Structures are given as C-alpha cells and as structure tokens.
UniProtKB/Swiss-Prot annotation:
Keywords: Cytoplasm, Exonuclease, Hydrolase, Nuclease. Its main location: cytoplasm. It is found in: Cytoplasm. GO terms for biological process: DNA catabolic process. This is Exodeoxyribonuclease 7 large subunit.
Amino acid sequence: MNLFFEKTGATNVAEFSVSEIAGALKRVVEEKFGYVRVRGEISGYRGAHASGHAYFALKDDKARLEAVIWRGIMEKLKFPPEEGMEVIAVGKLTTYPGSSKYQIVIEALEPTGVGALMTLLENRKKKFAEEGLFDEEKKKPLPYMPKIIGVVTSPTGAVIRDIIHRISDRFPLHILVWPVRVQGETSGREVAAAVKGFNVLPLEGLIPKPDLLIVARGGGSLEDLWGFNDEVVVRAVYESSLPVISAVGHETDWTLIDYVADWRAPTPTAAAEKAVPVKIDLEVYVVSLGARLRTGLARYFDFHQQKLRAIIRALPTADQLFALPRRGFDEISSRLERALCVSCDKKRLYFHTLAIRFTPRLLNTEKAQHSAKEYTARLHRAFVHIVEKQRAQLEIAFRLLKSTSYQNILERGFVLALGQNNKPIKRLAQIPEKEQINLRFFDGEISVITQESFFNRSSKSKRIKSKQDDQGTLF
C-alpha cells in the first residue's frame, strides 16, 4: 500500500473525512451557482408531505435533478405542482450530505407557459366529462326562496361584501361564510373541505345547514384561479347534496368548477341575484294574486247567484202545486156525498116497499117473523159494509188532501206571506213598502213591517206569541 502511494505521488495529498468532503462540495456548489433557473418536467410528485414540504424531481430526456419546496413557499405558490407538468423553477443549488445528492431548493415555480396550463386544463376537462361529472341531467335545481345561504370565499375583500350587500338589498336572510384561501397551493383543498363541511352540518344543529352554496372569487389570471381547477374541488361539488352556484372570476373566466356546479354565475354579484328573489317583486305578485282571487270569487258567486235565481223562477208556485190535488179532492168529495145520498134514498124506498107488502097476518106468524129478522140482519150487515167502504174511501181522500195541503209545506220550513185581506204574496214586487204583512208558519203567525227598499230590505218583526214558544230556526 505504501509502495502504491509512493509510486503515485499521493503521499503529499491532503486527507479529508467524508463529512469534510461533503461540506466542501456543498459550499462550492452554493457559492458557484447561487440562484439558478431550471426548466424541466415534474416527476415523482405525490403531493405535499405531512410536514407541508414537497419532494419531487425535475427531469429532461438526459438527466434528473432532485427538488424540494419548503412549506412556506408551497403556501405562496399560485398553482399546485402537477405530475408531468413542465415548469421553470427558480432556487438555489445545494447538496444533501446524508445521501451525497445535490438538489435545488425551489423558491419560485411557474409553468413554462399558459399553453401548458391550458393543455393540462383541457385534459382534466375531458376526463371529468367522460366520467359524467358535467352532465346537465345530474344538476340539482336551485331553491326559489332559501332560508340560509352558505358562502365559500375569502373573508376579506370585495367579493364577500358584494354578496352580502346584494342579498340584503334583494331579500335579507341568514348567510354563513366559510373562510378559505382562494389562491395558492392549499386553496383547492380548503374549498373542497368547505363544501364537504357545509354538507355534513346537521339540520337542527347549533350551526344550521344551508339550503344553497355559493363558491366565489374575484377575477385573476389562469394561475390565480388554478385552485378551482383542482380535482378535489370538482369532485366535492359533484358529490354535494346541496345545490352549488359557482362565481369564480369574471364573465370571461372559466374554471372546472363552473362546469360541475349546478349554476354558473358570471360574477359574485350575479350569484347573489340568482340565489334570492326580489322581496318587493314578491309582495307585488302576492297582491296581484289576491286581487285575482277576489275577482274570481266575485264572478263565481255572481254566476251561481244568477243560476239560483233562474232555478227559483222555474219552480212552480204554491197555487200551482195545490191546484190539481185540490180539484181532485173536491171532485171525490162531491161524488162521495152524492153516492151516499143516492144509496140512502134507494134503501129507504126499498124498506118502504117492504113495509107495504108485509101484512099483520104474515108478521104474526113465526115463519114471517123469522124471515123478517133474518132479512133485517142481512140488511144491517150490508148497510154497515157499504158505510165502512165509503168511510175508507173518504179517509183515503182525506189523506190525499192532507198530503197536498199547504200546511204540510209549512211544516217543512216554508213560510206563507199574506198581504192585505190575507191574500198570498207571490213576488217581491207585491210587498208594499212600510206596510204590515203577515208571515204564516206551521205553528203560528207573526206580523212584520217592511221598511227598506226592494234591494236592501230588513224587517223589524213584532212577534206574536204562538202556542209553542220553543220553535227552532228554519235554517
């Protein structure tokens, strides 16, 4: 071994420990290069570590450079790193003595151009569309009058002030704000967590569950709005059971959350206007509905009142109802009376004839007496039969007369109005003004004085005690 060092002349070379060599290399690299700009493709990115730091590599077709982004820098990035994204990294070269590796500590990271971000955005959009996340039939309808609105946005800035102001002007209601970062590496995860958080709130909890969500942010560049293109945001909105309105950027700005949301507003102010109706317009509409209802009811009652009057005019009067039965009763009564008289006359004549034919001699005989008694009994039975038959016919006629009597009509709740000389009043026009008329009920009569005109008539009645004081109302 000594011979080897003597032959190579290495005996005079300074001796270093491994740590000294690693430290020397670290100083040389850091002093020689300082800040550098490196273009490469992100490789091996698996998201931020639990500590908040990110570890990955930058590569091209010939080499590979390890990279690290500390937590403080990650939170300030305008867009999150993506696997396969071509970027320009700005940072310092250094070495890691523990594994004899050199790496770049990135302090700024940006894509190589907007075209790269647009390509990535289109690829994501195509992927989600193929999964059906943007299908119109899967979008939920917005509630017309929500009671509570949840807003996911930055707690500071003009966006939240515009939303609160616009909702308060149109239809004041309860607003819940879930504060999040709307720009930077963690913005997408915070927005997704807020949407999921609103969905899991209990309906009757201390913090009530909203009926509608608004995810809002002001305008900005593609890099500024990149957090709303995150996959976690798109899937959180798609899985939300609450309707979501997206209001990210200006009218010309489009992010993936706009495609998956149930309604896309061009601005945060437009989102507030879509979320609630105008209270004054609702009040005017309710008043108009009330007027239409009153008009409809008036027409309905007027139509049926006219129909009822037509039916009343078509009904027959009391005289018309009783005329035919009364005539039939009179005819039957007259025929019955004549029949009884004729029958009695015939029997009387027959008895008189028999009395002449009988002699005292015949009557004194036992046979004649027996025959006379028998004949008398038969005659009596025949007469009784005739009388009973006529009585039955008379009772039938009386019941028929009673069934058609106006007194029965009065017992069913009708009233007979009588004017002067107890003549029936058939029409309203026959009622004299400020005159006395009689109203006949089934159990008595009362006298009333007419006071008002034909169209507004009220009667002040002076009751006459009837035989029964406990008569009920007719209606």
